[in-house]
Amino acid sequence: MSIRTDKVSSLLQRELSAIFEKELPRSGPLVTVTEVRMTADLGIARVYVSVIGSEAQRAEVMEYLDAENKMIRKTLSAKIRHQFRRIPELEFYEDRLFEQANRIEQLLKSVKPARDEEQH
């Protein structure tokens, strides 16, 4: 990636995080923008979000983001329109890295006691 795409990604991540903080219901699951990847022409922003909640809540949040894509893009445009000629299209993807890390941690914890028992 170039310095320009990195800067745009960082700006979009910051602004989208602020939008989600204001727009999403407080009682729902925790939604975090973990990464934004830009295409080389800056036309598409792939937004990776981490959703901490039940499987149903995660699905609901992803459906909401897809359904409200135009509204989110319009809100983003109002915030950054002076910095860009063209606001990128937004594509939302669920980032399950946190969930996978927790699963690995649980597996490691379950293996460790078995090793300790073998040594005694």
From Swiss-Prot:
It holds the Pfam family RBFA. It comes from the Bacteria. GO terms for cellular component: cytosol. SUPFAM superfamilies: Ribosome-binding factor A, RbfA. Its main location: cytoplasm. It is found in: Cytoplasm. Signal peptide: none annotated. Keywords: Cytoplasm, Ribosome biogenesis. GO terms for molecular function: ribosomal small subunit binding. One of its GO terms (biological process) is maturation of SSU-rRNA. Belongs to the RbfA family. Monomer. Binds 30S ribosomal subunits, but not 50S ribosomal subunits or 70S ribosomes. NCBIfam families: rbfA. One of several proteins that assist in the late maturation steps of the functional core of the 30S ribosomal subunit. Associates with free 30S ribosomal subunits (but not with 30S subunits that are part of 70S ribosomes or polysomes). Required for efficient processing of 16S rRNA. May interact with the 5'-terminal helix region of 16S rRNA. This is Ribosome-binding factor A. It comes from Chlorobaculum tepidum (strain ATCC 49652 / DSM 12025 / NBRC 103806 / TLS) (Chlorobium tepidum).
